């Protein structure tokens, strides 16, 4: 069939070229539609279930909210694991599904299970699923702030919207904001009701998260003394507000043949109307809200805050829908924010702080630069070694054509163009088959012209092209098949490594398949069309000189093979020993151009105190000349996609381009050290320096933010915490450990209110009445809403902040007694019904698959991940004795490394088996198959030496490089063996066949090795964004091809000579024995 394809491609060459052009146009269109991202999205399929329970402790949340939800989810088909976190007033259950699951269907299933679980949950608890987004979802951050944060520098015009001469801020609706809370509440209102609704309509945006400021509320602050004097309870106050603030419909009336809709609208529209609401009557005199309480515009008791460059702001985050194009979505969000900025109230601005498209563009620029430079190097080698620009052009055209055809397949397989899928393309590797056919066609045409002594006729030329293509079709087909086969097992990668490398492998296989088809169709057709004139009879000087130098060594290797074979064995032995000195890591860290400084304080730190710590930290870091801006997110945002306690902050450090860094500062590590120096004097913080995407990936995949985590499982939280502290002490002594920390699970100060049930009964009250009074005064009680157009704001009854924190005021809080006939309503102070106690409680309870756990996390610097964990595990086993029933597991990036290493132990042998099977099909001789397979270990040896020389650890990226170089080495060996066998078929003696076959294949072997290795050179030496991820793969391929080429040209002929001589000695009719 293949020979028919070759003949047809030459016969109908113009049709083939026309169809190729059509496919190229379609490919160009598909390439333009290709989604672009930084890296493949390695986040597992998961759903986050968030529940807000403001009045519960962590243990209560675990028992009454988290556990029932976990129980409801258990047994759901497709669930792989669960993990949960219970904090003060908040629960999050993360459900992780199998990769084969349909996320939208699973969300529906989770929703049904939650509906079944609601009867088992406390009243008013409404579990909510997080947005349909991933670890790469936060594509755009922006800050909503005042153009002049404190009014300094603003143009002041009293009475007009903006800053006023008295220091207040006048809104466009006439509200005067004269305190910090109201001004921050106004910024949050702009974010929630102007920016967010418009931004959510942007294509590809799943949702928009808001953090910082205060959600605006109309706060009713009771005067407890006046309430007691008037005999008004908190329940009376709430009921009055609810009864006053309503709207009803009363159908319609007919009048003069027309229908009139009847409306009874008594909704409250302002704070003044709240103050005038009547609560009750005393001696026929109405008592209003304003007589017993102060009404003001305030904010919620917030759980999160944000700031930028030392000033409090509101930060918004655009979350990308799963599967969307991050570059397109981020650019669309930026464009939309520019439009929204024109509609903002005077004095308020939007400041973009993090734009993912900038990182995407920088990364793709690196990839494109490497691909273009690699392609140019490949073309240059083709021109130099072929000595015919037409032939070189034919081979070079396969490069863009294979890329365009691959783009069609990438879209069909939903693979984005990113650092891994496009960055690993080596056009030299891809066009090896085309190069072999072009080189052989060029050689045969030159020989035929020389024999005929004239230019060939059309029929002669076409006949020669078909014959030359047929001659090389066997090594080409099987050679390409070998390269294809070595990548096939990589598709069995699972988990994170599967998500990271499967797109790369599929893209490579698409490119190889495209180039293979083109080499059988387009290349013969182009050779027939373009190589019409006289073809040079001599080879280029470089090849001639190389052959002259090579022949004596080749003859020596065939005559005396053992020294050459011994050198090959020694090389492999040395490489095996050297590999033990190569470090290990899961993946090289992508330089995201920015940094993230995670700050954790003692558990009792309030959200306001966290902000007070963040503001000077931002100013200190901002003083570094290489830093462009610093913004912080403390606590939990509205969607709780990344929930943190009030004592934790994420400080995003946006760096300037490296060209603007000060002299002497050239690396990220230096910047991190300078940041540590700035933050060192700030006591009370525990820092962890990572990068934004890296941090989110680590957290979403493994539940931790750092490189390494030691997870300690057990039941007793006190024992878990104590064991974790001992493990942390060991980790801190382990070389390479940085940012070691243990989340503080206990030590959260608790103010307990203990009910005196006997006293409550004596006063004729119930526990619920007392509890409701406490809850309303402390936490606040919603009492309706005020509508302002589309906006709606809660009316909340709550004590003023200073009174909520004053024990004397709380003790005197009046609890209204039941009404007695004929008597004024009396009250009793709260202190006579309860007792106050200060204790310490739990800060957080974390669980994995229903098992409680505490983790110790650390980053690794100055050494590779694998050796660090080996060292730390040995120290922990020696120095830390685990209590009965307790065990530990390693998590974070090391967990991914472990899983990938186990998978590689299966993949690598499978690759060798597939290579051997393919070779045997091509050669038909077990001995010669084994001979060609010796190319693999020497190719691997070169990769090991290259890693060691460059100080690059072994990673999954390097492993893929080892697999790739094995295929190229085998391809070159197959090309050489095919030439040797051809001469044996012609009746040559074994030694002569080996020598002449090897001499004939010097040029194709050198060409395939050079184009494959030089295509990777730009990746190996690149310094742009994302280059660090490509370097291990490129380094291994280049180093491996150096040793593999030496093997092919020296050791392989030496081995082949021995094998052929023995076969000849065993069978006089050697020729027949060596046939396929």
UniProtKB/Swiss-Prot annotation:
The keyword Transmembrane applies. InterPro entries: AcrB_DN_DC_subdom, Acrflvin-R, CusA-like. GO terms for molecular function: monoatomic cation transmembrane transporter activity; xenobiotic transmembrane transporter activity. Coiled coil: none annotated. Keywords: Cell inner membrane, Cell membrane, Cobalt, Membrane, Nickel, Plasmid, Transmembrane, Transmembrane helix, Transport. It is a multi-pass membrane protein. It is found in: Cell inner membrane. Pfam families: ACR_tran. Induction: By nickel. The keyword Cell inner membrane applies. GO terms for cellular component: plasma membrane. The chain crosses the membrane at residues 14-34, 366-386, 390-410, 418-438, 475-495, 502-522, 561-581, 903-923, 928-948, 959-979, 1003-1023, 1035-1055. Its main location: membrane. SUPFAM superfamilies: Multidrug efflux transporter AcrB pore domain, PN1, PN2, PC1 and PC2 subdomains, Multidrug efflux transporter AcrB TolC docking domain, DN and DC subdomains, Multidrug efflux transporter AcrB transmembrane domain. Belongs to the resistance-nodulation-cell division (RND) (TC 2.A.6) family. The products of the genes cnrA, cnrB, and cnrC are likely to form a membrane-bound protein complex catalyzing an energy-dependent efflux of Ni(2+) and Co(2+). The mechanism of action of the CnrCBA complex may be that of a proton/cation antiporter. NCBIfam families: 2A0601. PANTHER family: CATION EFFLUX SYSTEM (ACRB_ACRD_ACRF FAMILY), PTHR32063. This is Nickel and cobalt resistance protein CnrA. It comes from Cupriavidus metallidurans (strain ATCC 43123 / DSM 2839 / NBRC 102507 / CH34).
């Amino acid at each position: 069939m293949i020979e028919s394809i070759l003949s047809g491609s030459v016969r109908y060459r113009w049709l083939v070229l026309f169809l190729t052009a059509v496919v190229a146009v379609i490919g160009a269109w598909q390439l333009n539609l290709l989604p672009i991202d930084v890296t493949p999205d390695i986040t597992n399929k998961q759903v986050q279930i968030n529940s807000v329970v403001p009045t519960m402790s962590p243990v209560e949340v675990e028992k009454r909210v988290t556990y029932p939800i976990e129980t409801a989810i258990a047994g759901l088909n497709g669930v792989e694991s669960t993990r949960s976190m219970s904090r003060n007033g908040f629960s999050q259950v993360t459900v992780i599904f199998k990769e084969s699951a349909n996320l939208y269907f699973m969300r529906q299933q989770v929703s049904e299970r939650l509906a079944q679980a609601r009867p088992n949950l406390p009243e008013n608890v409404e579990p909510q699923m997080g947005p349909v987004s991933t670890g790469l979802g936060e594509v755009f951050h922006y800050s909503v702030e005042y153009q002049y944060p404190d009014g300094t520098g603003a143009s002041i015009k009293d009475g007009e919207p903006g800053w006023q001469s008295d220091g207040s801020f006048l809104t466009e609706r006439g509200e005067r904001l004269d305190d910090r809370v109201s001004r921050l509440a106004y910024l949050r209102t702009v974010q929630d009701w102007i920016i967010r609704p418009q931004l959510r309509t942007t294509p590809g945006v799943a949702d928009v998260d808001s953090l910082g400021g205060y959600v605006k509320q109309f706060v009713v602050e009771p005067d407890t003394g006046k309430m007691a004097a008037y005999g008004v309870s908190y329940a009376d106050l709430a009921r009055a507000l609810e009864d006053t603030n309503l709207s009803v419909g009363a159908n319609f009336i007919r009048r003069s043949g027309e229908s009139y809709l009847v409306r009874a609208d008594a909704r409250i529209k302002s704070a003044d109307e709240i103050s005038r609401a009547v609560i009750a009557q005393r001696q026929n005199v109405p008592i209003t809200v304003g007589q017993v309480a102060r009404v003001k515009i305030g904010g919620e008791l917030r759980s999160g805050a944000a700031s930028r460059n030392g000033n409090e702001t509101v930060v918004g985050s655009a979350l990308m829908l799963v599967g969307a194009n991050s570059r397109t979505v981020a650019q669309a969000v930026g464009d939309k924010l520019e439009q929204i900025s024109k509609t903002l109230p005077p004095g308020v601005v939007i400041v973009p702080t993090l734009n993912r498209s900038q990182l995407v563009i920088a990364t793709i620029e690196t990839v494109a630069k490497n691909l273009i430079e690699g392609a140019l190097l490949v073309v240059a080698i083709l021109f130099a070694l072929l000595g015919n620009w037409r032939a070189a052009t034919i081979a070079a055209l396969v490069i863009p054509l294979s890329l365009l055809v691959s783009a069609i397949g990438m879209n069909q397989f939903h693979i984005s163009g990113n650092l891994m899928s496009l960055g690993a393309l080596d056009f030299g590797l891809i066009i090896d088959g085309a190069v072999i056919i072009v080189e052989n066609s060029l050689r045969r045409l030159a020989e035929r012209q020389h024999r005929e002594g004239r230019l060939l006729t059309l029929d002669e030329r076409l006949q020669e092209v078909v014959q030359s293509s047929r001659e090389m079709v066997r090594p080409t087909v099987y050679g390409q098949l070998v390269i294809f086969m070595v990548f096939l097992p990589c598709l069995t990668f699972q988990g994170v490594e599967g998500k990271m490398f499967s797109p790369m492998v599929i893209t490579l296989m698409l490119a190889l398949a495209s180039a293979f088809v083109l080499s059988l169709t387009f290349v013969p057709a182009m050779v027939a069309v373009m190589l019409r004139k006289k073809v040079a009879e001599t080879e280029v000087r470089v090849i001639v000189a190389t052959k002259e130098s090579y022949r004596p060594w080749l003859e020596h290797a065939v005559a005396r093979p053992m020294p050459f074979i011994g050198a090959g064995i020694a090389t492999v032995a040395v490489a095996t020993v050297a590999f033990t000195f190569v470090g290990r890591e899961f993946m090289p860290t992508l330089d995201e151009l920015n940094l993230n400084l995670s700050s954790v304080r003692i558990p009792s730190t309030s959200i306001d105190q966290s902000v007070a710590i963040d503001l000077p930290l931002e100013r200190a870091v901002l003083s570094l000349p290489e830093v462009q801006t610093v913004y912080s997110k403390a606590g939990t945002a509205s969607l709780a996609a990344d929930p943190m306690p009030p004592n934790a902050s994420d400080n995003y450090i946006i760096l300037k381009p490296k060209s603007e860094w000060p002299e002497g500062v050239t690396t990220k590590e230096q910047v991190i050290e300078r940041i540590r120096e700035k933050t060192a004097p700030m006591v009370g913080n525990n820092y962890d320096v990572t990068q934004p995407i890296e941090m989110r990936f680590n957290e979403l995949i493994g539940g931790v933010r750092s490189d390494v985590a030691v997870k300690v499982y057990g039941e007793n939280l006190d024992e878990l915490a104590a064991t974790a502290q001992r493990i942390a002490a060991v980790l801190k002594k382990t070389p390479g450990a940085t940012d070691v920390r243990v989340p503080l699970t206990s030590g959260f100060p608790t103010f307990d209110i203990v009910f005196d049930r006997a006293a409550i009964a004596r006063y004729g009250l119930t526990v619920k009445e007392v509890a409701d009074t406490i809850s309303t005064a402390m936490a606040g009680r919603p009492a309706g809403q005020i509508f302002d157009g589309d906006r709606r704001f809660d009316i909340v009854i709550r004590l003023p902040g200073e009174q909520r924190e004053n024990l004397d005021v709380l003790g005197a809080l009046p609890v209204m007694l039941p009404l007695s006939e004929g008597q004024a309503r009396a009250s009793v102070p709260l202190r006579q019904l309860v007792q106050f106690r200060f204790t310490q409680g739990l800060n957080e309870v974390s669980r994995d698959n229903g098992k409680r756990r505490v983790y110790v996390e650390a980053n690794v610097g100055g050494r590779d991940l694998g050796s660090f964990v080996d060292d730390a595990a040995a120290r922990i086993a020696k120095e830390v004795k685990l209590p009965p029933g307790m065990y530990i597991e390693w998590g974070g990036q090391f967990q991914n490394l472990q899983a990938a290493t186990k998978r590689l132990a299966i993949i690598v042998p499978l690759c060798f088996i597939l290579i051997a099977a393919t070779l045997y099909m091509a050669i038909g001789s077990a001995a010669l198959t084994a001979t060609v397979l010796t190319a693999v270990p020497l190719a691997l040896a070169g990769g090991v030496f290259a890693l060691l020389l460059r100080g690059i650890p072994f990673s999954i990226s390097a492993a893929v490089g080892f697999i790739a170089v094995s295929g190229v080495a085998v391809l070159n060996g197959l090309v050489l063996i095919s030439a040797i066998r051809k001469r044996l078929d012609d009746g040559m003696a074994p030694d002569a066949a080996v020598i002449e076959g090897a001499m004939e294949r010097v040029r194709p072997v050198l060409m395939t090795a050079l184009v494959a290795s030089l295509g990777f050179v730009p990746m190996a030496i690149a310094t742009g964004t994302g280059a660090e991820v490509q370097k291990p793969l490129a380094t291994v391929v280049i180093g491996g091809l150096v040793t593999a080429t030496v093997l092919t040209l020296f050791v392989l002929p030496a081995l082949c000579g021995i094998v052929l001589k023995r076969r000849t000695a065993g069978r006089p009719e050697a020729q027949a024995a060596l046939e396929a």
